[in-house]
Amino acid sequence: DEVKIVLD
């Protein structure tokens, strides 16, 4: 499982 969170 892969989780990616991007905050810009």
Curated annotation (Swiss-Prot):
It is found in: Secreted. GO terms for cellular component: extracellular region. Keywords: Neuropeptide, Secreted. GO terms for biological process: neuropeptide signaling pathway; regulation of muscle contraction; sexual reproduction. Vitellogenic follicle, fully grown oocyte, egg and internal egg-capsule (at protein level). Not detected in previtellogenic follicles, external egg-capsule, central nervous system and hemolymph. Has myotropic activity targeting the genital tract. This is Ovarian jelly-peptide 3. The lineage of its organism: Eukaryota, Metazoa, Spiralia, Lophotrochozoa, Mollusca.
